[in-house]
């Protein structure tokens, strides 16, 4: 698979730590009281204002399907207690207990999962989980969590049908 189109920002981080392994891809949502959309740059600014290193997510997917780069992939995310050293995190903009992910978000998420699974030798089945699978939280929201099997099926399809250059 060819790398997805990923928008990159010039984000500055405080101290970052290397990931030990890549065992999981963990899915998150914004989860605010409103179905709000935030860019990777806006999340980074909020996290820095909290005196954190910067955005805790490796990727953000906007409602229009645009994938945005957060933390560098070689680093630990800051998103899921006990699993930061062994996971990549994808964050979708929106509250998916209130709203639903857009068609564009779902397609981008499936393709990104497929590409990451191919890069790291993972399977979309078993290695892709919702935040709630590891921590006591509603994240990534019922409306997205209920779609993860379907999304992982699309990711698997992309892996089997899109080769480099397709």
Where do the protein language model's features map onto the residues?
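Short, solvent-exposed loop/turn elements at domain surfaces
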Residues: 34-37, 68
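Short Gly/aromatic-enriched secondary-structure transition segments
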Residues: 39-47
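A short acidic/small-residue loop/turn micro-motif
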Residues: 74-76
């Amino acid at each position: 698979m060819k790398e997805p189109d990923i928008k990159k920002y010039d984000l500055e981080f405080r101290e970052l730590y290397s990931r030990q392994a890549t065992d999981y891809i963990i899915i998150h949502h914004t989860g605010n009281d409103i179905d709000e959309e935030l860019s990777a740059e806006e999340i980074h600014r909020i996290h820095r204002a909290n005196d954190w290193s910067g955005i805790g997510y490796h990727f953000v997917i906007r409602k229009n399907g645009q994938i945005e780069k957060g933390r560098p992939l070689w680093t630990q995310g800051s998103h899921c207690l006990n699993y930061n050293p062994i996971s990549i995190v994808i964050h979708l903009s929106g509250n998916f207990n209130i709203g639903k992910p857009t068609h564009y978000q779902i397609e981008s998420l499936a393709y990104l999962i497929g590409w990451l699974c191919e890069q790291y030798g993972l399977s979309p089945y078993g290695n892709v989980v919702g935040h709630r699978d590891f921590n006591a939280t509603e994240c990534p929201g019922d409306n997205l969590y209920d779609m993860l099997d379907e999304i992982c099926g699309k990711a698997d399809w992309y892996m089997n049908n899109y080769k480099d250059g397709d």
